[in-house]
Amino acid sequence: MTMGSEFQFRDKIPVVVLGATGSVGQKFVELLVHHPWFDLVAVAASDRSSGKCYGEAVNWLMPTPLPESIAKMTVQKCQPDVPGMIAFSALDASVAGEIETQFAQAGYLVVSNSGSHRMDPDVPLLVPEVNAQHLALIRTQPFPKGKIITNPNCSVVGLTLSLKPLCPSKVCRALVRKRKCS
């Protein structure tokens, strides 16, 4: 059975967003708040924001309104005692490595947008439409129950999605030029 849009879980999976007050964290919140599979049960951020209501701690930048139920949530510290089975991490790379590892050691599945674990040989660098088989790497991770999965940076995601259809044609070289906006 494939998990298409018709698939329904009996119970939603409880999730937490780490780094929830930043722009990437806000995007995670926006995507998860009405998701059919996930129940956003906690938001976590820096010590500066923890203890505050999310609505007070965040400068909401998303085009959709912040749901009142989420705005009333108390921002938790980024420690692995927050509720949830999956941690969607939008943490800055300067702190993500240690915190994400702590969450994985505590049994969470960590889905990271940070670059901290991108070069770890046992962490899948996943673009599901291109390399879903890369998930097999999680079997080699040292955590008894938790795991870490990450994505490549935004330029690489677009590039791999564009180049994947060319693989059967045996294109051997692609010249890519990336320019950073400022």
What is each model feature region?
Residues 1-182:
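N-terminal Rossmann-like NAD(P) cofactor-binding subdomain of oxidoreductases
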